[in-house]
Amino acid sequence: KEFRLSEEEAVELYSNAPLHQLMSAALRRRNAMHGPEKVTYLIDRNINYTNVCTINCQFCSFYRPPGHDETYTQTFEQISQRIKELEEIEGVRILMQGGVNPDLPFEWYENLLRELRIQHPTIALDCFSPIEIEGIAEVSKLSTLEVLIRLKEAGMHGLPGGGAEMLVEDVRKDVSPKKGAPANWLRVMEEAQSLGLTTSATNVIGFGETL
């Protein structure tokens, strides 16, 4: 019998089911949906449009603070060229993330998305993690929901899931105290989902996390 798991059932499986049993069940479900001979994948590309950031995560060697001589922000043309290279190998999606850059006005993000949507109409644009959305909202003095609405109107397809390691408050306080509270990350994702934007969750591991 096919049915969706309830929230309680999902939590129970996550908390108590042996991993090998979950893996086996997932394989059986995939085979039932697509057949055992079919495996799907897509080709995408990560684009880091800026390394300017004010969050200063302890584990990040990528960011540079504003004013540092190694900072960069890519031009629209540079970003478009990276997408052209993706299209040449039949890629279908970008995941574009960067730092929380206080020097970029909200219009920069809107104009970038509009330009990319015109230049690359078939590419899914998954852009700006919840942490970046919070930063954009702060600079623009808009709510995160208003930011998401306008970015969707400009052509954004979904959000990458960066920053999910911060959902554990003790971890956040230890390695990235300037990031927003876990509730903020969840709120942005819930707002995105309410607008029909795709979302995911990705996290850096190795901070002593447990199930």
Regions found by a protein language model. Name each.
Residues 4, 38-40, 46-52, 58, ...:
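Residue-level preference for alpha-helix termini and adjacent loops
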Residues 14, 45, 163:
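Small/polar loops that bind or transfer phosphate-bearing groups
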Residues 18, 52-54, 58, 176, ...:
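Short capping/connector residues at structural and topological boundaries
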Residues 23-66, 71-97:
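N-terminal pre-triad scaffold of radical SAM enzymes
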Residues 64-211:
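Conserved Radical SAM active-site core
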